[in-house]
Amino acid sequence: MKRFTFSVPQNILFGEGVLKELPGVAGKLGGKHGFIISGPTLNRLGVVGQCEEILTQAGIAVSTFCDTEGNPSVETVERAAEAVRASGADFIVALGGGSPMDVAKAVGVVAKYGGSITEYEGADKVPGAIIPLITIPTTAGTGSEVTAFSVITDHKRNYKLTVFSYELIPAYALLDPTLLTSAPASVAAACGVDALIHAEEAYVSLDASPFSEAMSEKAMELIGRSIRTYVADRSNREAASDMLAGSLFAGMAFSWARLGNIHAMSHPVSAFYNVPHGVANGILFPYVVKYNEEAAFEKYRKIYNNISTEKKSAEEFSKGMLEQAVRELNKQLGIPAKLSDVGVTREHFSQMTEDAMKSGNIAVNPRKTGSEDILGIYEEAL
């Protein structure tokens, strides 16, 4: 067994109704003034107000920023950080999907240490602890509530920059399945596929360890058995719980094992064409599965048996089956089949390939990958 390191420096509360624990959690952080970062949809639906009321009834002051967008930008981080500084808040609550959480992590850095988030791009450039952060996911997808990453779009470069630091890991994550009922089917599908891909890429990663593999396997089991049910009926509490737990385990898995070519390639797609992250990942999923098959085949049957409606023995399983199962799942969930379906053209392929190759995920992809391979996958997926 190869050497590995694994630690989880975080507190996680999971279950129906744990949102009500928010004041107590804030109190453990010494919080007197919370700053909620969320999006306009959750604000309109009253979810932000619900969270705000829970805090104010406990005597905790609250300020809000409800202007995060999909693929959040450097400018959004700057505006939110200025609002945090002006408010005097001493802890941040990230409420929503991956976008508010990415913004909140970045804001926790910039509001405390100054400068632009671009100055912290890369690994281990955050000088110390950020403003204490509590994450409350309302989608089952990114796993950002437990990860050490923040991904922010730099429109000046048409580039999605990544900040990696263990300082970004939130102090607390509150996972309440009752909050997942407001997601539209299309969002539930894209987020669910994203979570599944987190588990799959971490599972076949060259950095996978027994701990990360165990989490990946459990994530794939939970997501595989419930994603179709949840997308069809977001009010199904059992399916929502499976999806939320699966997303959590997948997030923990890739925090330590990292990801692969799918994420390396999807970030440029989103940066150049503003395609939702989960949709971009989902489109690329079968093409990268096909590319990696020779190197990762030994693990493919377990992935297949978790996501397919059929089970195969070792004797029955053969090449191409996982790719086909992914295509069938995407079709069932309404994920587009081609990049051209979401407006992507060859115009930016050269720069997109260059940007994908900058990703640290390329190095841990199970099959060695060069720029010509990335370009070839983009071409095939078009």
Could you say what each language-model-derived stretch is?
Residues 1-29:
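N-terminal amphipathic/basic leader segments beginning at the initiator methionine
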Residues 20-35, 54-58, 86:
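Glycine-rich phosphate/diphosphate-binding loops that line cofactor/substrate pockets in enzymes
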Residues 43-115, 229-240:
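N-terminal small/polar loop signature for handling phosphorylated ligands or for N-terminal nucleophile
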Residues 75-178:
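Glycine/threonine-rich beta-strand-loop-alpha-helix active-site module
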Residues 141, 248-281, 359-363:
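Glycine-rich phosphate/pyrophosphate-binding beta-alpha loops
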Residues 149-257:
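Carboxylate- and glycine-rich phosphate/diphosphate-binding segment that chelates Mg2+/Mn2+
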Residues 272-348:
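Gly/Pro-rich interdomain helix-loop hinge
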Residues 345-382:
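Short, amphipathic C-terminal "tail helix"
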